[in-house]
Structures are given as C-alpha cells and as structure tokens.
C-alpha cells in the first residue's frame, strides 16, 4: 500500500526518515519528499513547511505526483483539553479551521465557504490508530477535534476565545485543516495524529522548545505502529 506521512518541520520527520529503507529524496517547490519502504508499505514522507498555505500546496503536489492511497499527518500540537499533558497523543475525529470567520453570511465559525464545517477523519484509520495505542501505559491517547490556524497559541486571551468557539476541542496546530481540506477535495482518506509539545496558553513557547523532540518521538513511534498494523 502507498501511504503518505506529512510533517511540517525537520524535527517532526527526521526520525521516520531515518527508518525508511531504500530512501530517495527530491525537492519540489521547496517541499521535501522522501520515498522509501517501511513495514511492507511504500511510504512517501513529506516535509511540508509550517502553516496552512505550505501544507495545502505541498499536499496538493503530494496527491497529484505520488497518488497515495491514505494520508497521515503527524507532528506536534498544543493541547487544549483540560485533561491533557505534554507528551499525550491526540487522534483526530474531525479537523476545523479556528481562524476562519464568514459567519456574516450564515456559515459556521471556522467553515470555509463551499466546504463542510469540519473535515471528518477516516473512521477506519481512526479506529486503527486507537487500537495501536491501547497497550501504551505512560502516554494518554485521546481522540477528538483538532483545530488549525496560522498562529502559535501563546496568548491566553486568544486561547480563551477559541475555547468559546469550539467546546470539544482537544488540540491546535498550524497545518492539519489544510491537509484535511485538500484530502477531502481529492477524496483521499486521512487521519491526523499529533503528540503534544505544549499546553496552549501556559508558557507555550517555552514548553514547545523544550518538548518538541519528545513529541516528535512519540508521534513517530505511533506512526510506525499504525503502518505495521495497516493492511
């Protein structure tokens, strides 16, 4: 099976890249694509760059050029739910934009005109990801909504405003909704799997720098387990 794995930053893709066999890397429009073999699958690992425009552009190139059967977006995120701690893992049930507001024209907050309010992750991939983490004892794994915007959420006032908009939000980051929207339009199944590097609004910038490598390791180990179980 041909599986695409997307991470925004070098820290988020480096460990998985080192695990690929017969790896070949090429750069297209500033985006790094590495093809290789892992767990019996052909894996295309994309380093997309940070933010929604980079994520949308690179995911479009990915789907047009490499035609993966499934897409997994991984990396770090900021925790939003009160039950979460740094290092925990969130599996997306749906993904929304948290910085889109066209409510003046009767759209839901976060809804892009012409698109659904949220982008539903593939149920089979969500179930498989959840199954892969059942044996984990030291990492809390939850599933729920992930929201995306082109801002790092370190301002407590902005965090509070987004919490008011999305009651059941578990994590925020800067690429997933763009990846999900492109996958939705191409009808390619996707899931977002993010490990928490910080808790939004609580000295997030300090925590992010300190725990990014830990989050990257957790998310990469999780991705490998999913690939090993994926049939």
From Swiss-Prot:
The keyword Hydrolase applies. Keywords: Amino-acid biosynthesis, Hydrolase, Methionine biosynthesis. It comes from Bacillus anthracis. Catalyzes the irreversible cleavage of the glycosidic bond in both 5'-methylthioadenosine (MTA) and S-adenosylhomocysteine (SAH/AdoHcy) to adenine and the corresponding thioribose, 5'-methylthioribose and S-ribosylhomocysteine, respectively. Also cleaves 5'-deoxyadenosine, a toxic by-product of radical S-adenosylmethionine (SAM) enzymes, into 5-deoxyribose and adenine. GO terms for cellular component: cytosol. Belongs to the PNP/UDP phosphorylase family. MtnN subfamily. It catalyses: S-adenosyl-L-homocysteine + H2O = S-(5-deoxy-D-ribos-5-yl)-L-homocysteine + adenine; S-methyl-5'-thioadenosine + H2O = 5-(methylsulfanyl)-D-ribose + adenine; 5'-deoxyadenosine + H2O = 5-deoxy-D-ribose + adenine. GO terms for biological process: L-methionine salvage from methylthioadenosine; L-methionine salvage from S-adenosylmethionine; nucleoside catabolic process. Its EC number is 3.2.2.9. It is an enzyme of class 3 (hydrolase). PANTHER family: 5'-METHYLTHIOADENOSINE/S-ADENOSYLHOMOCYSTEINE NUCLEOSIDASE (PTHR46832), 5'-METHYLTHIOADENOSINE_S-ADENOSYLHOMOCYSTEINE NUCLEOSIDASE (PTHR46832:SF1). GO terms for molecular function: adenosylhomocysteine nucleosidase activity; methylthioadenosine nucleosidase activity. The active site is at residues 12, 198. The keyword Cell wall biogenesis/degradation does not apply. This is 5'-methylthioadenosine/S-adenosylhomocysteine nucleosidase. Pathway: Amino-acid biosynthesis; L-methionine biosynthesis via salvage pathway; S-methyl-5-thio-alpha-D-ribose 1-phosphate from S-methyl-5'-thioadenosine (hydrolase route): step 1/2. InterPro entries: MTA_SAH_Nsdase, Nucleoside_phosphorylase_d, Nucleoside_phosphorylase_sf. Substrate binds at residues 78, 153, 174-175.
């Amino acid at each position: 099976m041909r599986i695409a794995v997307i991470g925004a930053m070098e820290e988020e893709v480096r460990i998985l890249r080192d695990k690929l066999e017969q790896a070949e890397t090429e750069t297209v429009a500033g985006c790094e694509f590495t093809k290789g073999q892992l767990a019996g699958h052909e894996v295309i690992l994309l380093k997309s760059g940070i933010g929604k425009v980079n994520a949308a552009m690179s995911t479009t190139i990915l789907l047009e050029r490499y035609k993966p059967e499934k897409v997994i977006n991984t990396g770090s995120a900021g925790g939003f739910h009160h039950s979460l701690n740094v290092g925990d893992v969130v599996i997306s049930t749906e993904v929304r934009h948290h910085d889109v507001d066209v409510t003046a024209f009767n759209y839901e907050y976060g809804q892009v005109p012409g698109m659904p309010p949220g982008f539903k992750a593939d149920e089979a991939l969500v179930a498989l990801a959840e199954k892969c983490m059942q044996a984990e004892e030291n990492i809390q794994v939850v599933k729920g909504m992930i929201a995306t915007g082109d801002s790092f959420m370190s301002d407590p006032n902005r965090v509070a405003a987004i919490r008011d908009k999305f009651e059941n939000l578990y994590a925020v980051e800067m690429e997933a909704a763009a990846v999900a929207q492109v996958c939705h339009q191409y009808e390619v199944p996707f899931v977002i799997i993010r490990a928490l590097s910080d808790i939004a609004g609580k000295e997030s910038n300090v925590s992010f720098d300190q725990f990014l490598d830990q989050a990257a390791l957790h998310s990469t180990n999780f991705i490998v387990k999913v690939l090993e179980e994926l049939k």
